[in-house]
Amino acid sequence: MLTNLRLVTLSSETSADNNGYQIIEDGMVGITNGKIMFVGSVSDSPLACHNDLHGHPDVIDCGNALVTPGLIDCHTHLVFAGNRANEFEQRLNGMPYEEMAKRGGGIISTVQATREATEDELYQLAIKRLNGLKRDGVTTIEIKSGYGLTLDDELKMLRVARRIGDMPDIKVSTTLLAAHAVPPEYKNRADDYIEYVCQHIIPAAVEQGLADYVDVFCEGIGFSTQQCQRVFETAKHYGLGIKGHTEQLSNLGGSALAARMGATSVDHIEHLDHDGVAALAANNTVATLLPGAYYFLRETQRPPIEHLRKLQVPMAISTDFNPGTSPIASLRTMMNMACTFFRLTPEECLRGVTCNAAQALGLEASRGKISVGMEADLALWDIDTPAELSYRLGVPDLVARIVDGELFYAK
C-alpha cells in the first residue's frame, strides 16, 4: 500500500475539481502482483483499522507526494546512430533542406549511420536517450524503426526496441516505420519500395514478433495516400495496428484515410482540415501533437486545436524524439510547449501524456489512469499542483516511478 499522497487519478470514478483534475487528498493506492487493487482515501482503505499505518510492513509512506499515472511518450524514434547537429547549424545559416539532402544529409545520413551500427551500439545509444525521459516520469514509451529501410536493418532496430522493453523500469510498444522514406536503392521507385515493405518487411516483423504497429509517413516528401493505404491493408492483414505521420507539411488526406482504416492515432496534423477532424471523431482516433518538431522546424501552421476540442477528439502529446526535427528527450518540455504554442491547458497536457497517450497505443484498458484493475504504473512528484508539470522546467521534481508495481527512485 502507498499512503500519505495526493492522487491525480484521471479516472471518471473520481470527482473532478475546478480545474478538471480528478484528485483524492489523503489518498492511498493498493498494489498486488503489479496491478492496482485499491484507490481511495486512507479512511476507506482495507488498512483503515490499523492505528499506525506508518508502521505497517506493507505500507510505504510517500511523504505527501502528488501522484499521477506514469507518463507515456507515445511517439519516438529513439533507436538510431549518428546525429545531425551540423545540419542544425546549416539550417540556421539558411541552407534549404533539399540542398542538405543533395549533399548526403537529412534522413539518409541517419539511415547510413544506423545501417553501419551494431545492435549493441544502437542499444547503448538508445539507453542514454531514454534516461532523460525516465527523469520526466515516463514509464511507457513507443519506439519506431524507420532508419534502416532494408529488411535486416528494420528488424535490427525493432530487436533493439524489444530489448529495451525487457528492462524492468520501462514498458515499450514497437512500431514498424519502414515506410518512412524512399531509400537510395529505390530512388524514383517508391511504388517498388512499398511492395518490398508489404511483401517482405511486414511479414518478417510479424513472424519474429517484433512489431505492435505499422506506421507511414504520408506526405509529399514521403508517400502518397495510395501507397500508405497499401501498407495499412497489409498491416491489418497480418493483425497489426496502424498509425500515421500525417498532415505535417501539407494536407493530403492521410489522417482521414488512417482514421477510416482504424488507426489508433495520427500524428503531427498541423495541416489537418475540418473534414479530417470529423474523420478522427467518427472513428475514435487520437490526434497526437508533436510540439517539439513544430518548434525545431519553426513552423507557423498550428494544429486545429479548437476544432479538435469541439468534436471531442482526444489529444495526446509526445516528444517525437528524433535526430533531425525533434532531438528533445523531455516529455515535460513538450507539455510546456503544447501550452505555450498550441494553447492547451495544463490539464489537457496531463491527459495528453497519460490516458490519451495510452489510447494512442491501444493501452487505454491497462495504463494511463489510476484505477482498480489497471497496471500499477505511477509517477510520484514533489510538487503542489498538477499544473506545475507543464509550468516549470529544469527542476528535478520527480521522486520516484512505479512500473508494474515495482518502485524505482529518481536518480
From Swiss-Prot:
CDD domains: Imidazolone-5PH. It holds the Pfam family Amidohydro_1. Its cofactor is Zn(2+); Fe(3+). GO terms for biological process: L-histidine catabolic process to glutamate and formamide; L-histidine catabolic process to glutamate and formate. It catalyses: 4-imidazolone-5-propanoate + H2O = N-formimidoyl-L-glutamate. InterPro entries: Amidohydro-rel, HutI, Metal-dep_hydrolase_composite, Metal_Hydrolase. N-formimidoyl-L-glutamate binds at residues 147, 322, 324. Fe(3+) binds at residues 75, 77, 245, 320. Its main location: cytoplasm. Catalyzes the hydrolytic cleavage of the carbon-nitrogen bond in imidazolone-5-propanoate to yield N-formimidoyl-L-glutamate. It is the third step in the universal histidine degradation pathway. This is Imidazolonepropionase. The gene is hutI.
